[in-house]
Design a protein with these regions (language model features):
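Beta-strand cores of modular interaction/reader domains in eukaryotic scaffold and signaling proteins
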Residues: 22, 36-38, 46-49, 56-57, ...
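Short amphipathic alpha-helical molecular recognition features
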Residues: 29, 40-50, 54, 75-93, ...
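Phox homology (PX) phosphoinositide-binding domain
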Residues: 2-163, 167-176, 450-452, 457-467, ...
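LRR N-terminal entry segment and analogous cap-like coil->beta motifs
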Residues: 135-314
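Conserved beta-strand elements of beta-rich interaction domains across eukaryotes
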Residues: 6, 28, 42-44, 53-54, ...
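Leucine-rich repeat domain C-terminal region
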Residues: 207-218, 230-284, 288, 344, ...
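Amphipathic alpha-helical interaction motifs in eukaryotic regulatory proteins
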Residues: 38, 53-63, 95-103, 113-117, ...
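Short amphipathic alpha-helical segments embedded in low-complexity Lys/Glu-rich regions
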Residues: 53-54, 71-83, 108-120, 239-240, ...
């Protein structure tokens, strides 16, 4: 994969930075003594614990490599080896032993590297360990469809290692050649950066405060960034040429931070561009079709979103968004997830979501569906876990021609008697194939709704034919039924009567719906649609 440049042995630590090792304490652990070792390289410090037997194993490996004299390690002691004076003397001798190993060469051989955990905390140790791993696995990782996970420490080590004019590997060991890393990152297509708000192990480094550069990842198509500080990430703009999927979690407070690293110039650049599209002087992320900005601290959908003109799917769930803005620029978007935000109104949303087919607004603060009535491409709508109370709110979406799935779970509306039947009755022919709250419409529900629609159709036809006088008995009974429906539903929509209102017009005709056990009537006498329509006609 790479040729090893001329080099000395081992791995050099942090360039010319001072390296110091101290055995700061000795602790009795069960039947042995553990020595606490503190290592400092530049401004990074970490601690480890080792027992004497581990020192002995290290020494044997170094002797085999002819790196130390056999007598250099303090000898074993079989009697009184737990005595305080002896432990203190050995602590000092082990400290001298380790410091001598560090001082003898700028480079650390692999056994010493692992013993002191330079492969976890030191940029040279980390880059060497990564190079060795990639020597064996790089081709398989690049060829697979699995996302390669990397840490900020690994990326920081690569970034810093590239800045130094040093040999590419140690002791002509082709396995640890840094060239393997360079070859790998230029071929990698799928990557997830897994950060943290915590310290890196026992060290003084904070994981999300490590800067790194992504500009060399020039073939990357999928990038997920979790728990990082985006202002410390260099080279993001270089990914515009290849990136197709972008996910950022627990990282930003605004979309602009990740989409427009040159954010300070945004206002002027926007003014220079067309009002209905991305600014002319700002290169767009033209290949990104999917963006996932879940679990951040976003308060708004800012205008930098227009720099993602090819988006088809956008996930903004689990944020603090209160309004749906600036999405009119995403003319290709079909799937939008705004669940678990703070949205309370949908006024005018159709003007911003013209081609949407799937919309999730679950877990917001909605009390009405007003504003969704012109989303003519909408197929799936999830408004579960909101504050929708009245059945007639569904009227706002009942004429959408493509609607197939509606989720109203965990809304007050679901506690209304015959809730499913009343909701399905508001739709036209779509109710037959409708999925409501994740449940497909049953044949029993289809029959119920068909009867309700037939009754309503017959009533509407007779009312039109008779042209009822204001003072006629029929008009009075009709008005009474409408008033009862208004009381049952505070929205006071008088365009249609519920089953309950129609049936209460005259109790002697008992216009019950088959399968409605709440009527208390003998269903065997009410199963025929013809009889029910005849009863309605007799009333007229």
């Amino acid at each position: 994969m790479a040729q090893c440049a001329n080099s000395s042995e081992g791995t050099m630590s942090e360039g010319s930075l001072k390296r110091e090792v101290r055995v700061v304490a000795a602790r009795a652990v069960e039947n042995h003594t553990a020595y606490v070792i503190e290592i400092t390289v530049g401004d990074c410090k970490w601690t480890i614990q080792r027992r004497y037997s581990e020192f002995h194993d290290l020494h044997e490996k170094l002797v085999a490599l002819k790196k130390v004299e056999k007598a250099q390690l303090p000898p074993k002691k079989y009697l009184r080896n737990q005595a305080k004076s002896f432990v203190e003397k050995r602590r000092h001798e082990l400290e001298v032993y380790l410091q001598t190993l560090l001082d003898e060469s700028n480079y650390l051989v692999t056994p010493l590297l692992h013993f002191l955990e330079f492969d976890i905390y030191d940029i040279y140790g980390v880059s060497q360990a990564l190079a060795t791993e990639l020597f064996e696995k790089a081709d398989a990782i690049v060829a697979s469809d699995d996302v390669c996970e990397m840490t900020p420490m690994q990326l920081y080590a690569i970034t810093e290692r590239m800045k130094l004019a040093l040999p590419t590997c140690a002791a002509n060991d082709v396995r640890s050649d840094i060239g393997h890393i360079m070859d790998f990152i230029t071929r990698l297509k799928l990557m997830r950066i897994v950060g943290s708000r915590n310290k890196l192990g026992s060290s003084s480094r904070t994981v999300d405060q490590l800067p790194f550069d992504l500009s060399r990842f020039n073939n990357l198509e999928y990038l997920q960034v979790d728990v990082c500080t985006v202002s410390l990430i260099e080279g993001l703009s270089e990914l515009k040429k290849t990136l197709r999927y972008l996910a950022v979690h627990h990282t930003v407070k605004s979309i602009k931070e990740i989409i427009l690293p040159e954010g300070d110039h945004w206002t002027n650049l926007e003014a220079a561009g067309p009002s209905n599209g991305p600014p002319s002087h700002v290169p767009t992320w033209k290949f990104i079709s999917r963006a996932d900005f879940r679990y951040n601290n976003l308060n708004e959908i800012d205008d930098s979103i227009k720099l993602l003109p090819s988006l088809t799917r956008l996930d903004l769930s689990h944020n603090n968004i209160t309004e749906i803005n600036n999405l009119q620029y995403l003319s290709y978007m079909t799937h939008l997830d705004l669940s678990h935000n703070n949205i309370s109104s949908l006024e005018g949303v159709h003007a911003r979501l013209g081609n949407i087919t799937s919309l999730s607004l679950a877990g917001n603060e909605l009390t009405s569906l007003k504003g969704l009535g012109k989303l003519y491409s909408l197929v799936q709508l999830d408004v579960s876990k909101n504050c929708i109370e009245h059945v007639l709110e569904v009227n706002y979406i009942s004429n959408l021609p493509c609607i197939e799935s509606l989720n109203l779970k965990d809304n007050p509306i679901t506690s209304i008697m015959d809730y499913r039947t009343k909701v399905l009755d508001l739709f036209q022919d779509q109710y037959v194939e409708m999925t409501l709250d994740g449940i497909k419409t049953s044949q029993k529900e289809i029959d119920k709704v068909a009867i309700l629609k037939a009754i309503q159709k017959a009533k509407d036809g007779k009312t039109k034919k008779l042209g009822m006088r204001k003072d006629s008995p029929m008009r009075k009974r009709h008005n009474l039924a409408v008033n009862q429906a208004d009381i049952a539903d505070p929205t006071q929509r008088k365009s249609s009567l519920s089953t309950k209102s129609v049936c209460s017009m005259n109790s002697q005709y008992s216009l019950t719906v088959p399968g409605d056990e709440a009527s208390g009537m003998d269903n065997n006498n009410n199963n025929c649609l013809t009889h029910q329509i005849q009863a309605f006609r007799l009333e007229i």
